[in-house]
């Protein structure tokens, strides 16, 4: 009669792996490029090009009635038209029946959630590309790294503030008033600035920076917000735009769009803005073995006032 201990070395578990009931989180970058844009809607059946119009203000020169009976010269009213073309984007996932049959996880539900995440991320990147291609950026010169452009500085930020205020741009974010709390400070009514996470260390070094944790009131703050400098509140994302190897020493140049109210617009198509769908196996496959999930959405984008948006090109401090 044999003796010994029965253990996992001589009797391995029938199921060598155990499935955790909780999935690990799927990475998702900060979505910072859409929330500051004005939202417009396009009606169905009247074309894909959406026209947004603005009447320009009248001249304030002259206009005095001097008693001569001569009327002031009439002025022609000027209207500025900005067009946005609605575009459609889509993504599909084809799933074999064996995955659905044998996977422990509810894959169709999870894959649908992934497509929903794709919708939000794709929209954000499209708005990022609009800012990257349609804004006049000014090189930072106030830094100390000796590059062209330099890292971001208070003087550079003040220069963009001067430009926007000189063009009568309106701020987007309200004042956060001072409170009787240690190590906090108020924020002014502010414009929005969008930055890459690579320059967060440089933002901490900017003169007068107020990090988000030092705001007196944390209610309603977006997770993507990083800090406040002068009249700008900075929001950061790992996917914010940059130009590879464009600096004088071959390092990346980061573009930071900075804007006020009604500087940009996002157009959503009525009845088509975001669609998540499912096609069953008997439709997708001749032997009914593959099903399909899909997501699609329509979006139009435009810079609506070039005078109310500017930005900085910057590098990082060495």
Question: Which residue ranges define each predicted feature?
Answer:
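Hydrophobic alpha-helical segments involved in membrane association or supramolecular assembly
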Residues: 52, 113, 117, 193, ...
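Structured loops at beta-to-helix junctions and adjacent beta-edge loops in soluble globular domains
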Residues: 45, 53-56, 96, 196-198, ...
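Short, charged/polar micro-motifs that form catalytic or ligand-binding hotspots
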Residues: 42, 98-109, 113, 183-190, ...
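Aromatic- and glycine-enriched pocket-lining scaffold segments that form the walls
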Residues: 175, 180-200
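Sequence/fold signature of self-assembling virion shell proteins
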Residues: 2-33, 146-172, 191, 198-318
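Short acidic, glycine/tyrosine-flanked loop/strand segments centered on an H-E-D-like triad
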Residues: 76-103
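Alpha-helical scaffold segments that mediate packing/assembly in large oligomeric complexes
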Residues: 102-178, 317
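N-terminal "assembly arms/tails" that initiate or stabilize quaternary assembly
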Residues: 1-85, 309, 316
């Amino acid at each position: 009669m044999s003796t010994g201990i029965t253990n996992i070395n001589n009797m391995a578990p029938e199921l060598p792996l155990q499935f955790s009931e909780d999935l690990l989180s799927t990475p998702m970058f900060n979505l910072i490029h859409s929330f500051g844009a004005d939202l417009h809607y396009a009606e169905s059946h009247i074309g894909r090009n959406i026209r947004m119009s603005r009447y320009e203000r009248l001249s304030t020169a002259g206009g005095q009635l001097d008693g001569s009976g001569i009327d002031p010269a009439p002025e022609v009213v000027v209207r500025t038209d900005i067009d946005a073309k609605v575009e459609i984007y889509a993504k599909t996932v084809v799933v074999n029946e064996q995955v659905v049959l044998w996977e422990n996880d509810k894959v169709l539900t999870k894959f649908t959630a992934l497509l929903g995440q794709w919708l939000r991320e794709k929209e954000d990147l499209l708005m990022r590309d609009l800012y990257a291609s349609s804004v006049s950026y000014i090189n930072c010169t106030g830094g100390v790294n000796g590059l062209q452009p330099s890292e971001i500085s208070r003087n550079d930020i003040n220069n963009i503030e001067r430009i926007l205020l000189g063009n009568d741009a309106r701020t987007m974010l309200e004042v956060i008033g001072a409170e009787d709390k240690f190590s906090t400070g108020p924020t002014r009514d502010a414009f929005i600035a969008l930055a890459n996470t690579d320059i967060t260390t440089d933002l901490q070094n900017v003169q007068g920076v107020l990090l988000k944790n030092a705001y007196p009131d944390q209610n309603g703050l977006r997770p993507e917000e990083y800090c406040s400098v002068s009249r700008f509140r900075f929001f950061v994302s790992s996917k914010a735009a940059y130009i590879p190897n464009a600096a004088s020493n071959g390092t990346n140049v980061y573009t930071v769009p900075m804007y006020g109210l009604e500087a940009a617009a996002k157009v959503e198509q009525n009845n088509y803005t975001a669609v998540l769908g499912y096609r069953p196996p008997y439709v997708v496959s001749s032997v009914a073995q593959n099903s399909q999930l899909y997501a699609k959405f329509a979006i139009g984008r435009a810079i609506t006032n070039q005078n109310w948006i500017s930005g900085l090109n910057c590098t990082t401090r060495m």
